[in-house]
């Protein structure tokens, strides 16, 4: 048991501690930045200084530091997070590592993401579930290409809170001038980011602990909050509750003939008993009769809660449908523009069918056209015939059916989708809806999706057969 938990148990007792812990708000955040900026060391320092490390963990870190550590005689706190053998041997992060801790004010889930460019897809995976990004910058190197890359991806994935931590200030003699130079450079870059982004920039030393949990004695010129104070005070719950009500149905709950409810997690907004709702895509309406949870019925539920809704009327709703407030403005379309992060070696090419999963709904979609690929080092755009591994671009999609969706910046759950290869069943990309386009009326076809897919494979691997493109024939 760590010392922080021991102190709280002594003060509150077991029941009091569990009750307090249950009602704490949760912040999911990630650490990102260029390789060797100190992301894993920062997480280790947060855990250590907030007294969240068990004695056996600390003893193991001391032992491992003598073998693979990089901090001399001191314990290498990065080893608390870098768990893979390859990570420890190379001194880098490869996989996304998750860590959990809590203070008296809040619970935290940390995603430690890799800095190397070839692991950008891992970083995007970590960012997709987070509310805040801690972006580390080495005070000696300043803003690097990978710093811009991770800032852009975090912004693209809808994160509205950034904490830019200028790390390794101890290696530049805690220079205020150097900090101000980096601050100005990042602020100039951040003007190109989308939407309103809350950016706070602080000087830290993860190795020494300056401005991480306690204010630094070496940087008296800095008068702002510590990193932990920022993490404990940022408000992300109210932002989700302020959005329009969205409830993707994950499961139709019918344990007996007398009960029929629709289970899922509220993506945004608030719902109350008696609210008039509409189910999409059917457009049928009813009234919320009950909000059922494991702990009993609620009169009101907000974003983030897993609930079962029962309705006053028997209307047809199935998995993948979306429940919204009656009269809500929701796009229903099979044609859209979406930013895509590509995550596999085989590039994304227009004309190929993929399985699409969006908010519990599964359908088939294809890229009709790649509008442009982003140069994520300077945020410029250039034309592209295909998207390579780790490439990010704006693509025009058509789906086999109309789906209720939002822009990703408005609601991530109903505006984000994953792209699955239909032959291997491997997730090959992630999409973020940026715009709903005019619905496409598809021509009737004598060719099945399988036949079109087979035709595409034959044309790719056996070009000497001179097979005709069936999808082009359908357009004539």
UniProtKB/Swiss-Prot annotation:
UniProt GO MF annotations: ATP binding; GTP binding; GTPase activity; guanosine tetraphosphate binding; sulfate adenylyltransferase (ATP) activity
Domain of life: Bacteria
Record-linked HAMAP family: Sulf_adenylyltr_sub1
Region feature G5, mapped onto this chain: 205-207
Pathway entry: Sulfur metabolism; hydrogen sulfide biosynthesis; sulfite from sulfate: step 1/3
Name of the protein: Sulfate adenylyltransferase subunit 1
Organism: Vibrio vulnificus (strain CMCP6)
Binding residues for GTP: 33-40, 112-116, 167-170
Region (G4): 167-170
